[in-house]
Amino acid sequence: MYKRQRENFINTESGFDPEKWKLFAEQGWLAMPFSSESGGFDFGPIELSILFEEFGKFLVLEPYLSNVVLSGYILDNSSFNKKNDFISKLISGEEQISLAYMEQNRNYDFKDITCLLEGTDSLTLNGTKNLVLNGSNADHYLVTVNHNEVTTIVLVSKDTDGLSINNFKTVDDRRISQLNFENVGINADQIVATGDEAEQLIKDAINYGTLCVSAEAVGCMESCYLKTVEYTKSREQFGQPISNFQVLQHKMVDMFIEAELCKSLLYKSMIDMHENNDSKYRSVSALKSQVGLSGKKVGEDAVQLHGGMGVSEEMSIGHYLKRFIAIDSQFGNSYFHLKKFNNS
């Protein structure tokens, strides 16, 4: 059943259910974090974390992170004079926008940019962006570029001449893209932000995104743990449920402890971001580092306790493990964030 439900969407071009995306808009979920001036509800990191925790429990495929959290945050907090037009289309679900900031061999450093925006009156963009979330479905891209040694964000349409897109499927069945810009013409009114404003917007959007995927991982862990407990109670060996075996009970307790540890760090990060404390970046790095380690442990133990069925397409457990692996590498893995935490 799980396989059939999932395959209905993961093998389509979009990789998610468009009808569910429309429902997200109708329920007001797409408007949650936007300011009231932009037509949103002024919800913050606490509410978004709760939402993403639920996303994690059910392995939601819809591209909320790329559209609302990353691109939405940058647009909503920028001084871009056309932002409300694009935000209203994001909120209604009419348009999708992806952030393109990752480049090859840059070790998660968003300031180290090789994509060049050159010229004065007539601007030309050249370069490549990798690992663009939901790139195949985006109508526009927020692209970080180097313009005269200054970090700049430009808005580029998917139909722009000189832009070629290569699409890929990730280990957890999400969609990412590589964007290649070759002599792409850029007008001055496509510049969203530049200089310190651009760098702060990207930094905060990434921190927001890191919090959200970490909350998603916490939801995944909770679901993994509960499904594993339920499975071990129903599977029998030697005339009794395998949940009666003490060594398996200890392993499930360890899974519970890992999930609760991450949940405590999540609450700390949510509060620091809600109060806009100076420690918000450090708190999120501590959370992300632990989530990467705990998530893989919980996922691997869940698969082991399910036996061979744990890695089958028919059961959700193996898909949780794949999601843990993907989340660990997103926005910096455990070791990257541990180093960032130690240096802050």
Please report, for each region that a protein language model flagged, where it lies by residue.
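Flexible, small-/acidic-enriched active-site or ligand-binding loops
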Residues: Y108, D112-T114, L131-V132, S157-I191
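Residue-level signal for inorganic ion chemistry
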Residues: L51, L99, G127, V143, ...
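Short glycine/proline-enriched turns and hinge-like loops at secondary-structure junctions
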Residues: F43, D109-K111, N134-A138
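A short core secondary-structure module
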Residues: N126-L163
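Alpha-helical interface subdomain recognition
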Residues: M1-L59, S78-K82, K89, G93-E94, ...
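A short, Trp-centered hydrophobic/proline-enriched beta-strand micro-motif
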Residues: G93-Q104
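N-terminal glycine-rich flavin-associated loop
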Residues: V60-N81
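Short beta-strand-to-turn element immediately C-terminal to the catalytic PLP-Schiff-base lysine
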Residues: L75-S79, V143-N146, L155-K158, N180-E182, ...
